[in-house]
Every structure is written in C-alpha cells, then in structure tokens.
Amino acid sequence: MKHFGLICALFLSCTLFAQQAYNIAAPYDPATVKVEEDQRGEVIKFVMNESLRYPGTEREVLVYVPQQYRDSAPACLLVCMDGILYDATTVLDNLITSGEMPVTIGVFINPGVVYDEDRNVVRYNRCKEFDSTDDNWAQFIEQEVLPQVRALKTKDGQAINISSDPNDCAITGASSGGIAAFTAAWNRPDMFSRVYTTVGTFVAMRGGHEYPAIVRKTEPKPLRIYMQDGWYDVWNPIFGEWFEYNLLMESAFNFAGYEAFHVWNRGNHSIKYGTLAFPDAMRWLWKGYPARVSKGTSNNGMLQAILDPAYDWLALPISSTIDGDIYPAAEGKIVFASGNKVCQLDADGQLQMVSTLKSGERLMGEGLSLRSNTLYKNGQKVAEGLRACLAVQELAGGKYVALCDASVKSNDIVSVLSEGTRALAVAPDYRFCVSVQENTHHLISTIMDKKGHMLYSEPFYFLHDLSNGTLATSGNVAFDMEGNLYVATPMGVQVADHNGRVRAILSLPAGGVDALAFSGQYLYVRCGQKLYVRKMKAIGHNPKQGAMSYQSQGQG
C-alpha cells in the first residue's frame, strides 16, 4: 500500500510538471526562414590561441558579413558569446534585407579553453570570462578580438569596416553569456548601447547578484536592454534562482528609467526560448535607428538632489600631465602638479601655471606643499616633522589636519591622524573626518573634538566594488555642503550618506576615477590622464571656508 501511494505521488508530480512545461507554439516569423544560399551572408572563421588577458586560452571566433555590406561605410556590430546562437545568421540575413536592422557585422566569440601538451582540457575559462563583473571581457573584445576581426578580408576582398560608435553596437548572450553581454555594456557604454540577454546569470557566481542594487544607485547610462527568461529557470539553486534575479534586474531597470523590455514565459534554463525571442529582440533594440539611445531619468532621490539634469560630464582637453591628486581652488577652479609646475584650471578648460615646486617638493593643496617633512603655505613654513605625510586639509583660521605618522612641531596642526593610508577629508561641521585605507571596501570615520583630538576611529563607510576581489584602492574624498561624501573609486564617483551607505554612483565613459576635487558647483575628476568636469546641483565644501552646520539625515 505504501508503494502504491508513492507511485501515485510520483505520477501526480510528473503530470503536474508536464502540465507546467513550456509548450506554446511560436507564431510564424519570416525572419527565421533561411534565405537562398546566394543571398546569405558570409561567415569567416579564425582561431585565437594567444591572449594577454586570458593567458593560454584558445577559442574560435566566427564573423558574419551580410550580403549588403560594402567596406566604403562602417557597418554596425553585433557581438555574441558562445558562438552562433539563436540561428542568428539567418535572422540577420532577413532583418537586414527587410530594413528592420541596419547593415550589421556579427562577431560570435566562443569562450576560452586551456589545453595541456596532449590537447586535454586543463581549464574551461567560460565562467571566469563571462560571469566576472569587471571590465576584462569588454577590454578583451576591444583590444584583442576586434583588431583581429578588422584585419580580415571577405572572399571578394573587402576590408572589415566596423563602426566604433556605441550607438551602432549591440551585444548579446545566453546564461553566463547573458550577464557577460550586460557587463560589457555596463562597464563600457562607450562601446555598446544595445543589449539582449536571455536566461541571464545574474546570480551569486562572481558578483552578478549585486547588480540590481548597483543599477538602482548608478546614474543611468545610455543603454537599451531586452531581457528574456522563464519562470522555471534554475540552473543550479546553490547560486540562486535565475528567474528571481532577472525579475530584480527588470525592477532595477524600471526604477532607474532605462529603455528596457522583458519577455517572461514558462521556460527553463534553455536557449530555446531566447531563440524564439531573438528576431523581436533585434527589431526592438534597433527600433528608430539611427536615433541615439538616450539616458533615462532615475527615481533615485540622491541622484536627483545632487545632479543638475542640464549638465553632463565635459572632457577638459589639457596638454599638461597630471601628477597625483587634484585639489579645489578658489572660484570653482582646481590646482594640480605637472612635473615641477603647479597648474590652475577652470571649468572652461583655461589653464595657467601659478607656481613651481622645488626639488623633492610635493603639492598638498591650493598653496600647500611638503618638502623634507615640512609643510609650506605659499612658500612660508607652517609645520615641521610631518613624517610619511599623505594628506593635509587646511581649516579656517590657518589650522590644519594632517594624515601622517609623527609628532608635529606646530600649534597650527590641530590634529594628526594615522588611521588612514591614502586620503583625508574633514566634514563641513569639523566634527569628524574620513580617511582612506588600502585594500578594503571601507573608509575610516574618526570623531574630532573641539580641541582637535582624534577619537573613536571606525571602519564606517562601505563602498561597492565590481572588480572581482582586486580591492583596488580608492582615490581621494570630498564632502558637499550637506555632509554627503564623494569618493573616487574604480566604479566611478560613489556618493555616501551620513550613515556610511553609498546611495549614488556617478560613472564616466572613461571608466574608473583616480582622483576628484569638488570646487564650488564644479565636480572635477581625473581618469588616468583625462580630466572631466561637471556642474552640479550640490555644492562642494572647502574646509578653508570654516565649519558649517547641515541637516542631519537621522539614523534610518
């Protein structure tokens, strides 16, 4: 009898599963019908057996060139992971012919595999390449794959001419390839504007589960995103529920104001349903082309409070090199060192040299320099004994806070902080300061009493990081007049509230931010040797202005 009951239960569960199985017939779509052979695009194959970013890997790359292509004009680009998925070449043949897609070259990249000397697989690189949330995969496409593609010739001798305009470039993938497509566009919106992800692996493999929160916090990027997933998509429950995380991603895109479309069905973790959706996904992603994909408007209250929607980042063309940090100066300007010269720059890009540095002298701020453990203000000695000094903040009344490891010989140095290892910022009300440490996601908050004593240091501010555990050191930090903290990080400028939580992230096409300065209404950032400026709604606080109160945000 027990066996009979068990058999009945199994039969019932199998029957219910069969009833839930995805069995909807797909309507006829002319884009899925193979065209005559003489109308098909050409497919060129090559093998990559060297890589700087993924050492030892070997992979096949397939390049689709449509019949309509002529090398006299740059073609659009579609990058796809895992080779030719979705019967994509047939769909491209049809959609390009019908005019529903522009002339597009397809680049289909298989994941890397490492072999031993006997051609046995030693390492499958797919998860590393596709599920990582850093910018390595995008850099690999840009610096290693596309140069080889552009070096090819078609069988009739045409060169491969691909547009570098992100508005002309799309990227797609399934499963881990789906998150790889999104990650490439997210990290490099200067490369891709259009994304199709199917059964995307936005789960806890290599950090993808953090994306929903990060999308909500980050200033919208010019991306158009089409998502497909099935209600029963669970490849491995150890890592999470695929469909649940796709729902969270769709919710985040909606909150952040993206052009995003989704198709949910009864499917599981399979390429079948992404293949059915592929023609419509391509139509939707390219709808209205060549009109540019634009940024949306986020519901993020912090972004709304600090950003002026009339202004975006502006690149400042400068011929001088930038050595080290940048510092706020009067009238919305900044200063920085360029060799032995101290240069001043305004928001219009007007550059002038204001002073020179002596041998061994280091710029520490507007008018501030350090030489032989001695601090100078406009050439006049202020304090001695600043050993291993990393940062100085000038307060009102000719007082200073220093980040160093020493007993300073000066009454003008009100506080010496040794907790940090990189940078320092004093809060607008002078009641605490923040310092940056290396190899951690936290910043140190230290209370300052009225006598200048440093008390109760604590790892208080928590930063986001998508670099997959490299723990890249953050750059310098600055406060606005409302007590919000701005931090230069590899992800962009992260803005934290009074309680140490990042609530906004400002990203740039150039990638990570090495240094920043908030001078009046203007936020300046350095990305390598590139400088950008943005006019803000928020106002930067310069400690030289004196202590200023601001409204508490409470403990919520």
Model-derived features with residue positions:
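Non-catalytic cap/lid and distal C-terminal segments of serine-dependent acyl enzymes
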Residues: Q19-S298
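Glycine/small-residue-rich hydrophobic helix-like segments
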Residues: P220-L223, M448-G511
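Blade/loop signatures of beta-propeller domains
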Residues: V293-D312, C404-A406, G452-M454, P543-K544
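Beta-strand-rich domains and repeat architectures in extracellular enzymes and scaffolds
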Residues: M302, D312-N340
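Beta-propeller fold detector
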Residues: L314-P317, Q352-T356, V382-G385, S415, ...
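Beta-rich, blade/repeat-based domains predominating
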Residues: S319-G332, L357-N373, G385-D405, S415-C433, ...
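Beta-propeller domains
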Residues: E331-S355
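Short loop/turn segments immediately following beta-strands, especially the blade-tip
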Residues: T446-H453, K535-P543
